[in-house]
Amino acid sequence: MRILLLSALFLSLTTLVLSADLGIEKTHVVECNRKTTKGDTVHMHYRGTLAADGSEFDSSYGRNQPLKFKLGAGRVIKGWDEGLLDMCVGEKRTLTIPPEYGYGERGIGPIPGGATLIFETELVQIEGVNNDEL
């Protein structure tokens, strides 16, 4: 009985730790009937900064062009594939993405290895979904 209880406690703590890795803050909540799911092609506006010093490394707003990609297909960092699920069009979220959900220890371009990333995101469109479905 004691081993069973300890096993259950360990699994609960492991789940808690894993779910705490990716920070998701809903900054503008929108109610809808159709939320994003794996496989959706989405259009996202975003602003990416380094948590360490707040410096901006990329932004779709400056280009006035949202990023289009297939959600959950591994075409973006893991923090986006997981952190942008269950969103409504018009919703805004701030994602705090640790290195293991971002670019890891290798980094890329202006993003150093081991960096925690902050993304301000806004869901602009889910392709193939009509306004009356939202």
From Swiss-Prot:
SUPFAM superfamilies documented for this protein: FKBP-like
GO cellular component, one term: endoplasmic reticulum
Molecular-function GO terms, alphabetical: peptidyl-prolyl cis-trans isomerase activity
Entry-linked InterPro entries: FKBP2/11 (IPR044609), PPIase_dom_sf (IPR046357), PPIase_FKBP_dom (IPR001179)
Activity: how regulated: Inhibited by both FK506 and rapamycin.
Catalytic reactions of this protein: [protein]-peptidylproline (omega=180) = [protein]-peptidylproline (omega=0)
Any one of the GO BP annotations: chaperone-mediated protein folding
First-listed, main subcellular location of the protein, grouped into a coarse class: endoplasmic reticulum
Keywords carried by this UniProt record: Endoplasmic reticulum, Isomerase, Rotamase, Signal
Cellular location(s): Endoplasmic reticulum
UniProt EC number: 5.2.1.8
Motif Prevents secretion from ER location, chain numbering: 131-134
Family statement drawn from the similarity comment of this UniProt entry: Belongs to the FKBP-type PPIase family. FKBP2 subfamily.
Purpose of the protein: PPIases accelerate the folding of proteins. It catalyzes the cis-trans isomerization of proline imidic peptide bonds in oligopeptides.
PANTHER family: PEPTIDYLPROLYL ISOMERASE (PTHR45779:SF7)
Name of the molecule in the record: FK506-binding protein 2
Gene for this chain: fpr2
